[in-house]
From Swiss-Prot:
InterPro entries: DNA_primase-rel, DnaG_primase, TOPRIM_DnaG_bac, TOPRIM_dom. This is Uncharacterized protein MG010. Signal peptide: none annotated. Transmembrane segments: none annotated.
Length: 218
């Protein structure tokens, strides 16, 4: 293990421990933020989530793993009403094109996968038992990610982006690209007045599995 990987693994355990052993006096804003988005502490911990300070602010983070299973960095979400993301370490940011958030938690089913925009959309899918899902953390996919999906024998891809203009246009463009790459591709739009899948989850927290299953029917 090289020095960089060793240091990243050390950071992972520090961030994870910070969240696991959080108290009312420290990192409480991060825990309350998760609750406002419909998630409990275990939802975040079991996917390797953690919390730390960056730029004197609390940031939740998720590990970013390369295709060969190595930890290469973190996706950090600022604990704030305004969405703000950072990739760390700053001195050598990880290449998102050669990795996925949630790679270690992926359970491929029926050679199919659901691609969502954001990390919290992905967590919402997991809450409903949709474990063959990954967050793109954006609207595009890299050639390296496409090749990895092919290596994993993925045949069908369901694109589940946000319910805004950017999400709809992004889904359309991605469908065209993935179809040309040989995948069977379907865009699934949110059939409700919710801006994204996490918001839809918040509106239907008590019967989320049934609601999401119905949304994914086509």
């Amino acid at each position: 293990m090289d020095v960089r990987t060793e240091r990243l693994n050390e950071l992972f355990f520090v961030y994870h421990k910070n969240l696991k052993n959080q108290s009312k006096s420290k990192y409480s804003r991060a825990v309350n933020y998760l609750k406002r988005r419909g998630f409990n502490l275990q939802d975040f911990l079991k996917v390797g989530g953690g919390v730390g300070y960056l730029q004197n602010k609390e940031w939740l983070n998720l590990p970013l793993y390369s295709f060969d299973g190595n930890l290469i960095g973190f996706l950090n979400r600022k604990v704030s009403y305004k969405k703000e993301f950072l990739y760390t370490p700053f001195n050598k940011p990880p290449s998102k094109s050669e990795a996925f958030v949630g790679l270690r938690e992926l359970v491929i089913k029926d050679n199919s996968i659901y691609l969502v925009e954001g990390d919290f959309d992905w967590l919402a899918f997991r809450k409903a038992g949709i474990l063959n899902s990954l967050p793109l953390c954006g609207l595009t996919i890299s050639n390296q990610q496409v090749q990895w999906l092919k290596q994993k024998k993925i045949k069908k891809i369901f694109i589940c982006f946000d319910n805004d203009l950017a999400g709809k246009n992004g889904a359309k463009n991605l469908k065209e690209y993935l179809t040309k790459q040989g995948f069977i591709t379907k865009v699934i739009e949110i059939k409700a007045a919710a801006k994204d899948w996490n918001d839809l989850f918040l509106l239907n927290n008590s019967n989320w599995s049934a609601v999401l299953t119905n949304q994914l029917l086509f």
